[in-house]
Regions:
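Trp- and acidic/polar-enriched beta-sheet ligand-binding modules for extracellular glycan
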Residues: 350-352, 364, 375-444
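Edge beta-strands of extracellular beta-sandwich domains
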Residues: 522-530
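Solvent-exposed, low-complexity, repeat-rich "mucin-like" stalks and linkers
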Residues: 450-484, 541-546
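Extracellular/luminal low-complexity segments enriched in Ser/Thr/Pro
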Residues: 497-507, 512
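Active-site beta-strand->loop->alpha-helix modules in alpha/beta enzyme cores, enriched
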Residues: 2-198
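C-terminal accessory domains and tails appended to enzymatic cores
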Residues: 6-15, 104-111, 123-142, 154-157, ...
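Disordered, acidic Ser/Thr/Pro-rich linker "stalks" and the adjacent N-terminal cap
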Residues: 300-366, 374-381, 435-449
Length: 560
């Protein structure tokens, strides 16, 4: 029986997971977020965990958060919050661009290539404070004008400077600043990969608004629920969904366990709540019931595809989209429901060949090909043929809808110098391929170690409370990475696990359950506690105390 090392506020040290006991001392992590407080919405639990596992984390804010509040105030709040999560002040960078909203007046730096944008705070170039100059000034002793080219240049410089093993970023949220960061981060990663094919970071992205800041306010101190899938029209301020499109497939999301200090009985003791409290100017602590869940959600992308190193020729259309790392793009980041544009190779309708040829100067190995199609309800590729230079050929019948990926496992094909994609038939004219990822290996070895987590009705279980009348509970196991076979066992009492269900013995009041792989390197431990109806209600009284605490904090912050 393993005991937790994270026991400051964990009254049940048995409740633990191998995820919290890794050594990431040699792992370099780079987090990009738009605003001071997005570090919490984007990755609070993951940051806190890997910081305690000694990862080196560099935190980058692209804007100064200066829409209504002075940058100096936002900087100090960010430094304090990052410190709570375990990120030292010297590891924080400020790019210094202006904080904006969705305005539809083309004032955002996203639209400015030649002439600088003017921010809402009145600035036209990057700036910081005396203690924390903007990144451009730190590197070049001069500020950068507010243009999209400089924004991209700064992203590229930071990625090249840190050469992080893991890059984390906010994804395509509703906010214009979030959208620009998501698009330009993908663009920058694609460019860096072409410059240096040996650099192959993991890319993790997360929606900060629908999965945290604007998520369902469903926190409970008893069996706190998992992060819910956002729904347009139901989730707060959620007017457009990219989830379900491209690689954002809900069932393929990565779910991170939450550390003990983010699962406390009261908000006052919760490490994430303490980090939120540092952002006084934003009053974001009042949204804590939306932010806290039993898991933290991400989507992952590989960057080790050899297609980035290939020269591409196409029979017609723009072939540069096929290996730029961007599976989608928009030209208007302000619209509530943006239109995907400039992201696909679309051969001309009258083109008789409709082919794209990937050619390598040095032979490569091909084991898997992943294709992303265009998003269209009426236009699609019906048949497509893939041919490799060694004679391998495979015809596939149609790409999935919504730009979702199609995986073609070729088996190990060696000494490949060309890969040809040929569209054989299609419906309509607005079809295309947004990205072609060609891999030399079917699997990818992640820096984040494999882990497992016991699920009860799709919820990550830790200390799980049930009514004494419950006799059977469904038990499943979530796994990340190559864990091998996971076995569930009851470590005390007379309850038994059979066919994915826990059959509870009347004599058991606390049931200790362990999930573990054969090697013992991946494991999870939970406790199921049986309570009477009255005791369950009494247990939930802490929720009332938390609501009173939040109500008082709202009143206090309003008058500050």
């Amino acid at each position: 029986m393993k005991l937790s090392q994270d026991t400051e506020r964990n009254t049940n040290p048995y409740i633990d997971n191998s995820f919290f006991h890794q050594n990431y001392k040699n792992v370099n992590v780079l987090l990009f977020v738009p605003h001071q407080d997005d570090e919490i919405n984007a990755a609070a639990s993951l940051l806190f965990t890997i910081a305690r596992c000694e990862a080196r984390i560099t935190l980058v804010y692209t804007t100064n958060g200066d829409w209504e509040c002075p940058a100096a105030v936002r900087f100090n709040e960010a430094i304090n919050a990052a410190g709570v999560l375990g990120i030292p002040e010297e590891n924080i960078l400020f790019m210094g661009y202006g904080d904006t909203l969705n305005r539809n007046d083309k004032r955002h730096v996203f639209y400015h290539t030649d002439t600088p944008a003017r921010s809402a705070a009145g600035y036209t170039e990057t700036y910081g404070t005396d203690a924390h100059p903007d990144f451009a000034f730190l590197q070049e002793k001069q500020h950068h004008s507010y243009t999209n080219e400089n924004y991209l240049k700064d992203l590229l410089s930071i990625i090249r400077l840190t050469k992080a093993d893991i890059i984390i970023g906010t994804d395509f949220d509703c906010h214009a600043d979030h959208r620009m960061l998501s698009l330009y981060l993908d663009k920058a990663i694609g460019m860096v990969r072409k410059e240096d094919p040996s650099y192959q970071p993991e890319v993790w992205k997360r929606f900060a608004y629908p999965l945290a800041f604007n998520a369902v306010a469903d926190y409970s101190s008893v069996n706190n629920p998992e992060t819910k899938k956002p729904v347009v029209g139901d989730t707060h301020n959620y007017k457009f969904s990219i989830i379900g499109f491209f690689y954002f497939i809900w069932k393929e999301r990565i779910r991170i366990p939450v550390p003990a200090m983010a699962r406390t009985d009261t908000f006052r003791d919760n490490i994430i709540c303490q980090a939120l409290e540092q952002h006084v100017s934003q009053r974001i602590v009042t949204e804590v019931t939306r932010i806290l869940n039993s898991d933290e959600i991400f989507w992952f992308r590989r960057t080790d595809c050899v297609s980035h190193t290939a020269d591409i020729t196409v029979s017609s259309g723009n072939g540069t989209y096929l290996n730029d790392f961007m599976v989608y793009n928009v030209t208007n980041i302000d619209d509530d429901v943006p239109e995907y544009t400039d992201y696909c190779w679309r051969p001309e309708a009258e083109d008789p060949d409709k082919t794209a040829v990937f050619k390598w100067k040095k032979p490569v190995t091909v084991e898997k090909i992943v294709l992303y199609g265009a998003v269209s309800t009426d236009n699609k590729i019906d048949r497509l043929m893939v041919t490799l230079s060694n004679g391998f050929s495979q015809t596939v019948k149609g790409l999935p809808p919504n730009g979702n990926p199609l995986e073609i496992v070729t088996g190990k094909q060696e000494n490949i110098t060309t890969c040809i994609l040929k569209i054989l038939s299609a419906t309509g004219t607005d079809y295309g391929i947004s990205e072609c990822e060609i891999y030399s290996s079917k699997e990818f070895t992640n820096k984040i170690a494999p882990f497992c987590k016991i699920l009860i009705e799709d919820n990550f279980a830790y200390e799980y409370f049930v009514n004494k009348k419950v006799k059977v509970l469904p038990l499943t196991v979530y796994t990340y990475g190559n864990t091998g076979t996971i076995t569930l066992t009851v470590e005390n009492g007379n309850s038994v696990i059979r066919d994915g269900k826990l059959f509870i013995a009347d004599t058991d009041q606390k049931i200790f359950i362990r999930a573990q792989n054969k090697e013992g390197s991946v494991w999870d431990q939970i406790i199921i506690k049986r309570l009477s109806w009255f005791d369950l209600k009494r247990k939930k009284l802490s929720d009332i105390a938390d609501r009173i605490y939040l109500k008082n904090r709202k009143r206090q912050l309003k008058h500050n």
